[in-house]
Amino acid sequence: MRVDDSVVTLQPSLSGADAHGTPAPANQLAEPLFYRRARGYVPRPVFLPKTEQNAPYVLGTGAELKATICLTRGAEAFVGQHIGDLENPATLNFYEEVAAHLEKLLEVRPEALVCDAHPDFLSTRYAEARAEREGLPLWRLQHHAAHAAAVLAENSHYGPALALCLDGTGLGDDGTVWGGELLFMFLLRGGRGIPLRGMTAPPFSYIAPVGAGLPGRMTLAGKHDARTA
C-alpha cells in the first residue's frame, strides 16, 4: 500500500516551559507540528478522556479536501495517513483501502460512523453507503465543529471552550454556508455554534463555493457588503 511522507515542522515544547510560561528554546526541546501526518506517525493515538474507555468503536470519515479518516478504540483515536482530495475514483479507492487497512491493523470493526454534514462529499456518501450496508448508526457533524473538536482533543482540553473557527466553507447547522463562527464547545457534552455576520459568497460550484479556493473573491464580497450595509 502507498505510504506518503509526513510533513512536519518543529515548535518549542510547551511542556518544557518555565514557571513564567516561557517556552524552552527550540534547540533544547521541540515537538512536531503536523501539516501532513503519514509515514512514521501513523498509527499513533491521540488520547481521549478516560470516560471514553468503554465507548463504541467509531470511524470518522472526514471531509472532501485533504481527506483522511479517524478510528477510535476505547480512549484512543487513531488518525489515518494522508490521502488527499477526494476528486476522482482512484483517490476514493485509496481512501477505502486506507480505512480497511487501519481497521485490520488495529483489529477494530467500527460500531458507528461519523461523517461531515455536507451531503455531497464523497466521504459522506461512503459513510452513508457503509452504514446502510452494515446496519451501523450514522452521525453527522458540522465541518467546523469537527475542526474545533480535533484541536481540543489534540491538546487534551475536555472542558468548556470557545473556538473561533476561520476555516474555508462548510455547511452550517442552519442550512447556510458557514465560513467563520464562534463555537461553544464541550467535548463531553457536545457544542453549539454562533455564526459571525453573514456575507455574500461567490457563485457555487458542485461541492463548495468558489470562494473556498479563491479567498480574494471572498475579500471583494466582504468589501461589497460593507459598502451596501
Stretch-by-stretch model annotation:
Residues 1-229:
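Short acidic/glycine-rich loops and adjacent helix/strand connectors
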